[in-house]
C-alpha cells in the first residue's frame, strides 16, 4: 500500500522539478534576449523585415502595385552615432522604372506594418536599376 503512494509521490515531485526547470529556463532566455538587443537593433530588424515583405508584395501585384520588371531587395546600411542608428538606407534594385505610387507603397508599408517611429528612425530607400 505504501509503495503505490510513494511512486505517485515521486512522480508528482519529479513533475514539479521539471516544471520548475522549464520555467527558470524560459525566464533566463527571455531576459537574455531582451537585454542583448537594444531598441535600435530591433528597429533595424523591423525595417529590414518590412522592406523585404513590401518588395515581395509588389512583386506579387498586391493591391494594384505592379511593375513591369522585378524588384530585388539588395540590403540595408546604417551609421552608428553612439547608441543611435542614423542614415538608414534600404537598397532596392529594379529592372524597369518604378512608379511613384509603388515607391511610396514600399516605404509606407514598411513604416506602418512594423510600427516604425519616424521621429527617431527615419530611413530612405535607394532605388537602382
Curated annotation (Swiss-Prot):
Keyword set includes Protein transport: no
GO CC term, one of those recorded: extracellular region
Predominant localisation class: secreted
Bilayer-spanning residue ranges: none
Function: Minor component of the type IV-like pili. EpdA is not essential for piliation to occur, although its presence has a positive impact.
Highest taxon of the lineage: Archaea
Pfam families the record matches: Class_IIIsignal (PF04021)
Post-translational modification: The N-terminus is cleaved by the prepilin peptidase EppA, which recognizes the class III signal sequence.
Record protein name field: Minor structural pilin EpdA
Domain notes: Contains an amino terminal motif QXSXEXXXL, which is part of a class III signal sequence.
Propeptide: 1-8
Keywords: Fimbrium, Secreted
Extent of motif QXSXEXXXL: 9-19
Annotated compartments: Secreted; Cell surface; Fimbrium
Disruption phenotype: Deletion of the gene leads to poorly piliated cells.
